[in-house]
């Protein structure tokens, strides 16, 4: 497939009618040594990253990212692709909330964080989540 971004809306039958595509995924079903070429190339605005994973591995990326599948020159590339609607529509807020959640998880493992400080950070995270869920 040539370079493109995925459509914003997935039009399908119930229960998926008018589903917003926030995240795209590619599940690799063939091992990299079974075909030549066929890399999923994702462009982040400055650089392209080529991805070709083992069978059973999945990559998830923003549906608005420019991406393409490079030409398969030998063998057969077998993948399952799909789209996910996030509770958080704004991609920047989705990234911020994910980063915050990961950091809270790291802090939770430390012994020297007062419980009251951790609880306040967790409250702020959940308030942001509530404000941005759709």
Model-assigned labels for residue ranges:
Residues 55-59, 78, 120-123, 128-129, ...:
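Long, contiguous binding/interaction regions
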Residues 1-80, 84-98:
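Catalytic core of non-heme Fe(II) oxygenases with the double-stranded beta-helix
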Residues 88-124, 128:
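Charged/polar low-complexity intrinsically disordered segments, enriched in acidic residues
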